[in-house]
Amino acid sequence: MLAVRVSSGTTFPPFDDAVGQTRILTGTLAEAQEAALSAAGFTLVASAPTDAPYLVFSDRVWFTASFLRCVRATGGVGRVRISDETWLREMGPLQTAPERPEVALLAAGAPPSLDGPDLPVDLQLRAAPPVVLHPAFAHAQRPLVTGTRLVHGVEHWSHVLRVNLLALVATAEEAKAEFEASPFWKRALRVIGILLRARSIKPHAIARALNRVGTGCTIHPTAVVEACQLGNNVEVGPYALLRGCIVGDGAKIEDYAHASVSVIGAGARLGRTAMCNFSVLYPGAFVSAGGGWQMCVFGRDAFVAMTATAYDLSFGGPIRVVHRGAVVSAETHFLGVAIGHRAKIGAHVKMGYGMAVPNDAFLVAPSGDVLRKWPDAIEGAATVRDGVAVPVVAPKPAP
């Protein structure tokens, strides 16, 4: 079946890229769409066919191959409609019409349009209950929705996070489904191969055996890398920790750095002792030493200095963000910040949750207490005279 992509003209701050250039795993949204279409047996064409039914979709919607197969199997005509309440509640925020993703099947000769009757599609999702790690943030825990039939619009920077996390889930779910559908002998050989690589039945050893590592990678013997996909020429330093991550070509994970369930782009760098969870680093981004970052997006060639901080958890109401020029609820209590392309964040800068730093911005912390020269006989300041410390004299209050 043929497929036609229609342009939405969508951009969103802080990145302002054409939406098709949004980073999804190791490529772009446009590339992810094309890969899913190919895997599902669709051929992307420039104009609508006149002699056969076809698929039409927006350039701002992400989907899996399993979702496309499900749509085609309906045999109907119309725009996809989803009725799963859990999916709409968890994935709906900041989407224009989450119940009607911008994907449709059209009859032969019909003009490429996303208008039309509803075409019900069952995503067959599973919702695992949230794991409450601590009562203090039980209010922020959300159920994990999993499956292989996934679709999501990309209209806000928070969607970059959500879609990348969904893509990670879909990658694991599709591998699991492929394994379960294979013949018994093939599954047995696969299990034996994993156990031989793991040399153990312990979960951590098996997780290491599931890694996919490109050529030219350097992984220090003390580093822990589990259930990850590493591109070519990736460096992982001493005592670094990577769990459930996709890492692009030439990325560098320095000593004691920690990343979990994150996407680290080509040439990106995670500095010593830095921590990133549930985050996306565009190619060339550099998160410097120290500090913890969760649910954040770092733009292309962005730089974040040591001791910069972003809040990510609201203990009050849902976090509010800017969307289409208005401040609205993101309908979540757990969300970090977005750092624009080439933006620079200096030491000690503190950013509130939901904040978006524009492209090319340069933020520095207040510098009123920065010592710029040695004080000379200023009352209240410590000094040294002839090698002898002069006691500090308390400043007198102003009259």
Describe the residue ranges of each PLM region.
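Glycine-rich hexapeptide-repeat left-handed beta-helix
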Residues: 256, 271-399
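Surface-exposed, flexible loop/turn segments at secondary-structure boundaries
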Residues: 11, 62, 225, 242, ...
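Terminal amphipathic alpha-helical/low-complexity segments used for targeting or macromolecular assembly
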Residues: 1-210, 355, 360, 366, ...
